[in-house]
Curated annotation (Swiss-Prot):
Subcellular location: Chromosome
Gene that encodes the chain: REC114
Region listing for Disordered, in residue ranges: 157-190
Protein name, per record: Meiotic recombination protein REC114
InterPro entries: REC114L
Record's function text: Required for DNA double-strand breaks (DSBs) formation in unsynapsed regions during meiotic recombination. Probably acts by forming a complex with IHO1 and MEI4, which activates DSBs formation in unsynapsed regions, an essential step to ensure completion of synapsis. Required for spermatogenesis. Required for oogenesis.
Organism: Homo sapiens
Keyword rRNA-binding carried by entry: no
Disulfide bonds, paired cysteine numbers: none
């Protein structure tokens, strides 16, 4: 996963190679005691981290944008600052996502170190923010299942217009948006999107409930992987790979394996 830093927004990608959604805010969970060794900030049955570092989208600090590119890379930018960056390919082993209305909660566990961050989508209206969230969930569903606690199924058309809601019959188990069978979805077709149900009389769900759902299961559904690449797409793809701090180590391992294979042939 890439660390926050200053990076150019121009990745050499065309509009058809990347999907973007505006965010109202991004928040990162900060462990309550930074002097302790890093570890899971949430465990089943315990209270969530008390501190969140919040980034608001504005002209002064920079507008927040969530981007998913054709290579499967996921980014969150504020202006030219990279806040999050990782590949969704194979993320089923360390990533979980929960949706609540127009918000997404992400939980990652890598080498026994866990962290949480969340985003809230923006729009000119509440309906448009929900539509942006639904569209992003459908894109994420190409790689990983998005979980929804005790949800109502909301069917949205990914074209301008208000969403239509229908009640879900199953209220005793967590809902999820399954991964999609293909990467090319037409915006004029209806997309099924899932939102969380009303966990309280005012229709709100606590962060504790979301976190418990996020960390309840060790098993995640199979990720959808796509590998249709043309030679002309290698440049932008390599630029994206170089933004991942783990990529140089991966290249070294590949070189070692290639040398082993070359030695066997000789």
């Amino acid at each position: 996963m890439a660390e926050a830093g200053k990076v150019p927004l121009s990745l050499g990608l065309t509009g058809g190679e990347a999907a973007e959604w505006p965010l109202q805010r991004y928040a990162r969970c900060i462990p309550s005691n930074t002097r302790d060794p890093p570890g899971p900030c949430l465990e089943a049955g315990t209270a969530p981290c008390p501190t969140w570092k919040v980034f608001d989208s504005n002209e002064e600090s920079g507008y927040l944008v969530l981007t998913i590119v054709i290579s499967g890379h996921f980014f969150i930018f504020q202006g030219q600052t990279l806040l999050e960056g990782f590949s969704l390919i194979g993320s089923k082993d360390w990533l979980k996502i929960v949706r609540r209305v127009d918000c997404l909660l992400f939980g990652t566990t890598i080498k026994d170190k866990s962290r949480l961050f969340r985003v809230q989508f923006s729009g000119e209206s509440k309906e448009q923010a929900l539509e942006h969230c639904c569209s992003c969930v459908q894109k994420l569903a190409q790689y990983i299942t998005v979980q929804v606690p005790d949800g109502n199924i909301q069917e949205l058309q990914l074209i301008p217009g208000p969403p239509r809601a229908t009640e879900s019959q199953g209220k005793d188990s967590a809902k999820s948006v399954p991964r999609q069978p293909g990467s090319h979805q037409h915006s004029e077709q209806q997309q099924v999107c899932v939102t969380a149900g009303t966990g309280a009389p005012d229709g709100r769900t606590s962060l504790t409930q979301l976190a418990q759902t996020l960390l309840a299961s060790e098993e995640l559904p199979h990720v959808y992987e796509q590998s249709a690449w043309g030679a002309e797409e290698l440049g932008p793809f390599l630029r994206l790979c170089l933004m991942d701090q783990n990529f140089p180590a991966f290249v070294e391992e590949v070189e070692k394996e290639l040398k082993k294979l070359a030695g066997l042939r000789n």
